[in-house]
Amino acid sequence: MDTLLLARLQFATTTSIHFLFVVVTLGLVTLLVGMQAAWVLTGNPKWERLTRYWGQLYVINYVLGIATGLVMEFQFGLNWSGLSRYVGNVFGAPLAIETLVAFFLESTFLGMWIFGWHRLGKGVHLALLWGVAITAYASAFWIMVANSWLQNPVGYEVRDGIAHLTDFGALLTNPSLGMALGHVVSAALLVGGMLMAAVSAGHLIRRTPDFALFRTSLRIGLITAALAITMVQGFGFAQFGPVGSVQPTKFGGDNPESRALIAEWTTRFGPGDYTPPALASVGLGFMILIGFTLGCVWLLLPLLYRDWIIRLRFPLWLILLGLPLPFVAVILGWISREVGRQPWVAYGLLRTEQAVSPVSAPLMLTSLIGFSLLLGTLAVTNWVLLARHARRGAADPALGRPPAPPSEPAHPEPALI
């Protein structure tokens, strides 16, 4: 098999699976902040129980998501040495900031939040969760800064065949960044809202004891999902203008701007196929179709009145069975964004075939199989653990459980008089 194809398949596999963990993390942490803030402000134990229950699911996903991220980093280092050599001075800056500032701070805040239950004041404990959320969004921001540079290189100059950063501010004002970041963040909120609504619907279908608790989380999830899908659609369609101006070939080569750019590339780099594969447009089309389908969540909101959504029960099944849709949509969107810039890894600068490492096809195939099996195992483990802990209900989650009182000795020794 072709080494380049294997490398691209490996990139698609590792980044797509990791991205599923990322959107769950971003979506749930936002809802957790709201629930814990409600507990701190009102003192209502219902909000504490909801925070502990959903926080436990968040921690499971976060821990296994770190493992998938490490696999993705190995994949980058092994397969794309040409990318690191040519654009590492530019591309590496936002990635370094994301790792050193955002990720390490996020992990530190999360660890203190996990072990700070019943040890820290409510306000301090809530501030730690705010720190987790802010640094999580900071991580997403810097990752999108790096990816947007690959989509539309700005603020650089090429010296001795290597790209060097000349304008850091240009990275932050990249036309490819703003709407894409809003699209990703709103997609994460959609995933978090749908996950919360679907799990709550499952408990309400089964008529588990915590009816009032899951009734509340169903409402939170549905309202979040409805608002988020509107944001997703807005940011998504708003991207067409900026993307069309900086990447004319993304939506095909049959327009004057694309033909002029392809002619320029042919002169500079020689003859070749400079239009992206049809997979980009197919993925985009299916993503839009799923997006409009998820927009029907708005039709469920009136049924929240007097709990008609629970009385009818059929809408609960729709919510539960619709849970995979936002996950499929985010993967299709990511594929469309990445495949749409082909045959470039850095648009108009470095072709994908020039970025791949000089690795033999058998070795590349071996790493593809190994990483795919490892990531598949992590993904299945994550969903099994999430399903198991979600099904147990909110009676007594392990997260935030009060410490057991010290046990009395079985035979107390007589006191000396």
Model-assigned labels for residue ranges:
Residues 1-417:
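Polytopic transmembrane helical bundles with strong interfacial aromatic enrichment
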